[in-house]
Swiss-Prot record:
<dbReference type="InterPro" id="IPR000206">
    <property type="entry name" value="Ribosomal_bL12"/>
</dbReference>
<comment type="similarity">
    <text>Belongs to the bacterial ribosomal protein bL12 family.</text>
</comment>
<dbReference type="Pfam" id="PF16320">
    <property type="entry name" value="Ribosomal_L12_N"/>
</dbReference>
<comment type="subunit">
    <text>Homodimer. Part of the ribosomal stalk of the 50S ribosomal subunit. Forms a multimeric L10(L12)X complex, where L10 forms an elongated spine to which 2 to 4 L12 dimers bind in a sequential fashion. Binds GTP-bound translation factors.</text>
</comment>
<dbReference type="InterPro" id="IPR013823">
    <property type="entry name" value="Ribosomal_bL12_C"/>
</dbReference>
<dbReference type="InterPro" id="IPR008932">
    <property type="entry name" value="Ribosomal_bL12_oligo"/>
</dbReference>
<dbReference type="GO" id="GO:0003729">
    <property type="term" value="F:mRNA binding"/>
</dbReference>
<dbReference type="GO" id="GO:0022625">
    <property type="term" value="C:cytosolic large ribosomal subunit"/>
</dbReference>
<dbReference type="Pfam" id="PF00542">
    <property type="entry name" value="Ribosomal_L12"/>
</dbReference>
<dbReference type="GO" id="GO:0006412">
    <property type="term" value="P:translation"/>
</dbReference>
<dbReference type="InterPro" id="IPR014719">
    <property type="entry name" value="Ribosomal_bL12_C/ClpS-like"/>
</dbReference>
<protein>
    <recommendedName>
        <fullName>Large ribosomal subunit protein bL12</fullName>
    </recommendedName>
</protein>
<keyword id="KW-0687">Ribonucleoprotein</keyword>
<comment type="function">
    <text>Forms part of the ribosomal stalk which helps the ribosome interact with GTP-bound translation factors. Is thus essential for accurate translation.</text>
</comment>
<dbReference type="InterPro" id="IPR036235">
    <property type="entry name" value="Ribosomal_bL12_oligo_N_sf"/>
</dbReference>
<dbReference type="GO" id="GO:0003735">
    <property type="term" value="F:structural constituent of ribosome"/>
</dbReference>
<keyword id="KW-0689">Ribosomal protein</keyword>
Amino acid sequence: MSITKDQILEALAAMSVMEVVELIEAMEEKFGVSAAAAVVSGGSDAAAAEEKTEFDVVLTSHGDNKVAVIKALRAATGLGLKEAKGMAESAPVAVKEAISKEEAEALKADLEAAGAAVEIK
């Protein structure tokens, strides 16, 4: 009679952490393997192929219409007048970080419509 996977899982669930560690060590010795994680050797192509999912919106300049930019900053971030003014005057500064591409593009459009220079990173 053979043991099923479910029976093995149930037996493991009933073990203490120390018993599981001892079991792993015994398996390493018996089969001549290591439980270390395998190293994936991917080039920079793999990183370039992944699409970026989080973006930062950076105000690079408030432009000629600082008042409109401050209003747009307040609407986008919920900051008070003093904080939004300080943000506009301390450009370049991150307006929002780790947001979706759609949200970043919408924020950039709003700020550019107010006269600001904006980058998405």
